[in-house]
């Protein structure tokens, strides 16, 4: 993906970095799939503002699990990782809700 830094300013000095994250309502749901396997589904991250592929990659590394991005806006992780994902996204500045 193309770098969004078009100003030439160092990334840490850009005032808009992370802007709007608290306004995004991210929802985490766990779904039970075939053979009793669980899948953690994260939706509500705006792909126009955030690099969803990068977030998915970081999440997969954080929870040591496989996963994918569906339809360019939904992150699916293998296994039940609700609490780890919630903490990770809240630390990034997102407003997160977990559904049981």
From Swiss-Prot:
Pfam families: SUI1
GO molecular function ontology, one term from the record: translation initiation factor activity
Keywords: Protein biosynthesis, Translation regulation
Domain of life: Archaea
Keyword Protein biosynthesis: yes
Record has Protein biosynthesis as a keyword: yes
InterPro entries: DENR/SUI1_TIF (IPR050318), SUI1 (IPR001950), SUI1_arc (IPR022851), SUI1_arc_bac (IPR005872), SUI1_dom_sf (IPR036877)
GO terms, biological process: formation of translation preinitiation complex; regulation of translation; translation reinitiation
Family from the record: Belongs to the SUI1 family.
UniProt cross-references to PANTHER family, sorted A to Z: DENSITY-REGULATED PROTEIN, DENSITY-REGULATED PROTEIN HOMOLOG
Name the UniProt record assigns to this protein: Protein translation factor SUI1 homolog
């Amino acid at each position: 993906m193309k770098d969004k830094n078009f100003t030439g300013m160092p990334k840490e000095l850009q005032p808009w970095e992370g802007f709007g994250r608290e306004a995004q309502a991210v929802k985490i749901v766990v779904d039970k799939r075939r053979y009793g396997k669980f899948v953690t589904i994260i939706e509500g991250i705006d792909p126009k503002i955030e690099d969803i592929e990068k977030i998915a990659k970081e999440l997969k590394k954080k929870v040591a699990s496989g996963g994918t991005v569906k339809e360019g806006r939904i992150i699916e992780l293998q296994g039940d990782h609700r609490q780890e994902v919630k903490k990770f996204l809240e630390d990034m500045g997102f407003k997160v809700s977990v559904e049981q």
